[in-house]
Each structure stands twice: as C-alpha cells, then as structure tokens.
Regions:
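Structural signal for short hydrophobic segments within the conserved structured cores
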Residues: 35-37, 97-99, 130-133
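A short beta-strand-turn-helix
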Residues: 40-65
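Short loop/turn elements that flank and shape the SAM/SAH-binding pocket of Class I
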Residues: 45-46, 106-108
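Short pre-active-site segment immediately N-terminal to redox-active cysteine/selenocysteine motifs
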Residues: 63-66, 70-74, 117
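Thiol-based oxidoreductase modules, predominantly thioredoxin-like and allied folds used
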Residues: 70, 81-89, 93-107, 115
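C-type cytochrome heme c attachment motif
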Residues: 73-80, 120
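Non-catalytic, surface beta->alpha helical segment in thiol-disulfide oxidoreductase systems
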Residues: 117, 122-153
Length: 153
C-alpha cells in the first residue's frame, strides 16, 4: 500500500514537472509575427507625417509602406475587418506596417483626413501619395492593394 502511494505521488510530481517545463519552453519562444499598431496623435507625428511642422507637404516618415485603419470600437464592419488586418500584419511582417487609429479618441486625426465613414483605410506607399479607401473590404482586396500599391509587385 505504501509503495502504491509512493509511486502515485512520484508519478504525479513527474507529470507536474513535465507540464511546467513545457510551459516554460513555450513561454520562452519569441513570437515574431507582427500585430497591428495603435496610433495616437503623438505617434502619428513621429511615425507617419508631421503635419504640424509641414502642413502643406506630405513627407512620410516611415521606413516601410503602411496601412492605417481608421475605426471605432462600436463599429460592426470595423470589428469584422480587424482580424483580417491582424492576419495581414503577420503575413506581411517586415514588409509593411498596419496601424490603427481610433476615431473616437483621435478626433483630430479623423478630421485631418476627413473621415466621414468607417472603416476607412489609408494606404501609404514609400515614394508616392497616399490613397484612401472606405468601407469594409475582403482580404483579397487588401492583398491586391498591398501588392499593387504598397509593394508594387
């Protein structure tokens, strides 16, 4: 009887150690997949364009092409597009940035781009003028725009 209890205790402890070690290994892995990046006005001025310094000229400050999603937390179509943008951020990791601007919190940015309908998307190529698109789009349309406008494949 004592042997059974001892074996059972040792077995349970071994199992617990194995599970804990597996969790530690998984937690140690770096997740390289890029996520969408939330922008505030201050971030926008540093990463996208400093419209206060250069109000008449578009000078993109980024080092990669970008998409900016102008959204609101209550917007149904915005919620439908959000996972698609997360997938695209991971899929095009290292090639483009995918930013998000909450139009409720960043009303100045929304007004600057004359956002009247959400979701709205600003596609920013490296050496060209940005292009705006309005309304929810399927993933295939985003990929077309990324490949054609941003990456010029």
């Amino acid at each position: 009887m004592i042997k059974r209890v001892l074996f059972l205790t040792v077995g349970i402890l071994s199992l617990m150690l194995a599970v804990c070690e597996t969790k530690a290994i998984n937690n140690g892995k770096k997740e390289n997949k890029m996520k969408t990046i939330e922008l505030t006005k201050a971030d926008f001025l540093k990463k996208i364009v400093d419209y206060e310094k250069n109000p008449e000229e578009w000078i993109y400050l980024g080092d990669k092409p970008a998409i900016i999603d102008f959204y609101a937390s209550w917007c149904g179509p915005c919620k439908m597009v959000a996972p698609v943008l997360e997938e695209l951020a991971a899929e095009y990791d290292g090639q483009i940035y995918v930013y998000k601007v909450n139009t409720e919190q960043e009303q100045e940015l929304a007004a600057l781009f004359n956002i009247r309908s959400i979701p709205s998307f600003l596609f920013i190529p490296m050496n060209d003028k940005p292009q705006m698109a309005m309304g929810a789009m399927p993933k295939s349309s985003f990929k077309e725009a990324i490949d054609g406008v941003l990456l010029k494949k």
